[in-house]
Amino acid sequence: MISKIITSIFGSSNDRTLKRLRKRVAQINKLEPAFEKLTDEELQAKTAEFKQRLADGASLDSLLHEAFATVREASRRVMGMRHFDVQLIGGMVLTNRNIAEMRTGEGKTLTATLPCYLNALTGKGVHVVTVNDYLARRDAETNRPLFEFLGLSVAVNVPGLPNEVKREAYKADITYSTNSELGFDYLRDNLAHAKEDRFQRELHYALVDEVDSILIDEARTPLIISGPAEDATQIYQAIDTIIPHLVQQDKEDTEEYTGEGDFTLDLKNKQAHLTERGMVKVEGILTEMGLMQEGETLYHPARIALLHHVYAALRAHKLFELNVDYIVKDGEVVIIDEHTGRTMAGRRWSDGLHQAIEAKEKVNIQGENQTVASITYQNYFRLYEKLAGMTGTADTEAFEFQQIYGLDTIVIPTNKPVIRDDRTDLMFKSEPEKFAAIIKDIQECMARQQPVLVGTASVEKSELLSAELTKAGIAHNVLNAKFHAQEAEIVAEAGAPGAVTIATNMAGRGTDIVLGGNWKAEIAKLENPTEEQIEAIKAAWKERYDIVMKAGGLHIIGTERHESRRIDNQLRGRSGRQGDPGSSRFYLSLDDALMRIYLNEGKLNMMRKAFSEEGEAMESKLLTKVIASAQAKVEAHNFDGRKNLLQYDDVANEQRKAIYEQRNYLLETEDISAMIETIRGDVFNRVIDQFIPPQSIEEMWDVAGLEEALKRQFGMELPIQHWLEQENDLHEETLRERIIDIATQEYHAKEEKVGSEVMRNFEKGVMLQNLDELWKEHLSAMDYLRKGIHLRGYAQKDPKQEYKKESFEMFTNMLDLLKSNVISVLSRIQVRSQEEIEEAQRQQEAMAQAESENYRTADHQAEAQQSESLTEEQLANLDIGRNDPCPCGSGKKYKHCHGSKARYA
C-alpha cells in the first residue's frame, strides 16, 4: 500500500527512465528536418563520419542522436518505414545492457536496426539472436537493404553452412544467427587445432530477440558437442590375444636385479608396466601382426597409441576381475561400484579400459561417446561485452534478468493504446465440459467471421482438441514446431475472416497476425505481379480486414493456464496489436495440470461439489487472482532452481574460461618453448620432491625410487647412487639442478636433430592434444561429482561449498597431470630424423581432423537433418582433385574431408 502511494507521487523507476528518454527523443526529432534535406550520398557518408569520430575518441552515446536520426531517415527512404517515437525509445533502451518489453506488433524488428547500427560502428561486430533459422533469415533479408545503404555488411549464420561461408558471416558488421548455432560455434572454436580454423571474433554486442525464451526458458539447456572415441575395435581384439603370452614378474627391474618376466603390477594404483624384456616381446608380436614395422619401437612417435592399448589390455586381464569389478549382463560389461557392490548401468571406464575388458570378455566392443565441450546459454551469453534483449513479455521475469544477467527491464509504451478485451477465466468441472464450451465459443466466432487463435499447453492437447473440432465439422489449421517457415506462414494467415488456428503456446512467435490475412504474402507468391494484380489483392484484403474489424478482431482462446504468467501473456499478446480490436479468454477445468498440482484433493473435491449442473461454468475475478498467485509461486520456485543450478555451473564456467584462455594462447603463440622449460622444471622438481624431500638429510632420501621414477616417467637412466658415492659435495640442490640440466640437454639434443621449427610445432601439438584429452575427462569427472554432491548434506556439509572445494582440487590435479603428461611425452620421444617427428605431427593433425568431423551436436531443439552421402567405396572410385569440393556434400575441400581420410587410411 505504502509503495503504491510513493509510486503515485514520484512515479516508478520505469516511468522515470521513460521521462528521461523522451527528452532524448525530442533531440532526435529536432535533427529530422536537416537530415531530410541530405542527399543519399551525404546520408550514406554519415557512417564513415561516425566511425572516424569514434576513432578520434568520441563515445557511442555522444553519437546516438545523430546515428538514430540517420537510421530513421535511411529507413524512410529505403524501406518506406519511419521509426515511431516509441521505437526510438526502444532503440535507446537496447543500446545498453537492458531488456525492452515491447508488445506484439510494435515493430521490434525495425526497432532493432537502431542499436544494431550504432554498435556496429565500432567495427567489433553485432550478433542479432533469434530462436530459429527462419526468423534469422527473414529479419536479415528485411533489414539488409537498410544496412547496406548505410555501408554496413549483413550476414546470416545458420547450421549447415560451409566453414568458409560461416567464417565470412562472423566477419560481417551485423550477423543474424540462432542462439544454438552461436553457442555451438563458440565450442567448435575452442576445439580448433589452428587459429585460422576458428569462426568467431571477440563477443562484443548481442541483441537477443524473444529474450525470455532464450535466457529464461532455455537457460539450462546445455549445448553439448560429443565425439565418439576412435573406432579401434580390431586393434583391441588383436592386442587382447597378446596378453596370454606375457609372464608376470614379481618386481621391477633395477641395476641389481633383472627378472625373467614381461610385466609388473602395481596393485595399489591398479597400474601395469612392461619390463624391457616384455617390451621387446610385445614389439615382436605386433610386428608379426603387421601393426608395426620392422625395427620400430613402442616409443616411436607413430606407435605411442599402440602402447596405450597394450597397457589397457594388461590392466583388463590382470587387474580387473569378472564378478568383482564388473559383470557381463545382456552382452554388456557393467561396472560394479566398489563401495556399494551395486551395478552402475551406463557408466564406462575411460582410457580404453572398458573396451579392453569388452575384448577380454568377447562381447561387442562399444565406441566411447564422450562430451568434449559444453556450455549453457546462461554462461554463453554472459560472455558478451554488451548484452540486450527484446520481447513482448519480460516484466514478470524482471527480477531474474537483473539477478542473473545484470539486465534492467524497461516496459516500452505502445504507439497506440491497447483496446483488447481480456475477459475473466471460465472454470469447468472436467476437461470434456471445457472442450465443449471452447467449441461453442469457436462456432459463435465463426458465425460472425471472427478469426480465432486457440493456444494449448502441449502438442498432445493440440491433437486432442483438433480431433474434437474435426468431429464438430470445424475447418482449422494445427501448428507444430517442426517446420518454422510453414508455421510462420500459417500464423500470418490466422487473421483471415473465420479462420481457426490451434497452436501450442510458443508456436509462431516472431510473426505478426495481420487482421484480414497477410496481403504481402499473397503478392510474394506471384511471379512479376502487375500493378493491377497488386491493387486487386490489396482491395480484397481491405474487404476482409473490415469484416474482421467489425467482428471484433482476433479472438484468443487459452485452453489452460501455463505455470508461467509470461507464457499466458504471450498468447494474449497475439491479439490487439497496434490499437486493433481483439479479445481473449482462458478456459480452465479441475483436470488441468496446474489445478491438480497446486490444489490438494480435499479442495478439488470441494470445488467439484460447487458445480451443480453439467457444463456449468464458474466465473470469478477472485479465481483469476488465486491462479495468478499460484503462478507467481511457481515462477519464484523455478527461479530459485535456476539460480541454484547456476551457482554450480559457475564453478565449471570459471574453469572453462581458464582452459579456453590457455588454449587460445597456445593457438596464437608460435613459440611455447619458454612455457615448456618452466613446466619441465615444475614437473621434475615435483617428482624429485617425492623421493628427496626439500631441506632433508641424505638418510631420508629414496635414491632407488627416484632412479626408477625418472626411468619410468621420462626414460632417463641416471646413476644417481653412483654420483652420491663418488662426489661428497653433491647435496640436494646441486643434485636437483644436475637432473634438470641433463633432461634439458637431452631435449635440446633432440631439437638439434629435427630443427627448432619442427620441435616448436610438435610441442604445441602435444600440449593441445593432452589439454583436450584431460579436459574431456575432467568434464566427465565434474559431472559425476555434481550428481552425487547433494549427499554431503546428510553429513551436515554445504553441498555447494563441498562442490567448489573438490572441483578446485580436481582442476589443479588435472593441470598437474597435464604438465606431467606433456613433459613425459616430450622426454620419452625418440627421434632419429626430421621425417619421424613430422610423421608424428601428421598423425596428430589427422586425429584432430577426424575428431572435428565426428563431433556431434546434441541439442533438444535441433531437428534431424538427413542427407544422402556417398560410400567410401564410391568416393575411392571418383577422380577428384585435392582442391575440389568433396562430393560427400560437406562443403569442405576434398583434401580436408574424405581425401584426408584416404591419406591416413
UniProtKB/Swiss-Prot annotation:
- Segments of skewed composition (Low complexity): 843-852
Q: What PROSITE patterns does the record tag this protein with?
A: SECA, SECA_MOTOR_DEAD
Which keywords label this protein? ATP-binding, Cell inner membrane, Cell membrane, Cytoplasm, Membrane, Metal-binding, Nucleotide-binding, Protein transport, Translocase, Translocation, Transport, Zinc
Main subcellular location: membrane
Query: Which residues are noted in the entry as Zn(2+)-binding?
Result: 886, 888, 897-898
Query: What GO molecular function annotations does the UniProt record carry, in alphabetical order?
Result: ATP binding; metal ion binding; protein-exporting ATPase activity
Q: What class of enzyme is it?
A: translocase
- Give the residue ranges for region: Disordered: 840-905
Q: Which Gene3D superfamilies match?
A: Helical scaffold and wing domains of SecA, P-loop containing nucleotide triphosphate hydrolases, SecA, preprotein cross-linking domain
Q: How does it assemble?
A: Monomer and homodimer. Part of the essential Sec protein translocation apparatus which comprises SecA, SecYEG and auxiliary proteins SecDF-YajC and YidC.
The UniProt entry's sequence similarity note says: Belongs to the SecA family.
Q: What is this protein called?
A: Protein translocase subunit SecA
Species assigned in the record: Actinobacillus pleuropneumoniae serotype 5b (strain L20)
Organism lineage reads as:
Bacteria, Pseudomonadati, Pseudomonadota, Gammaproteobacteria, Pasteurellales
What would be the name of the gene that encodes this protein? secA
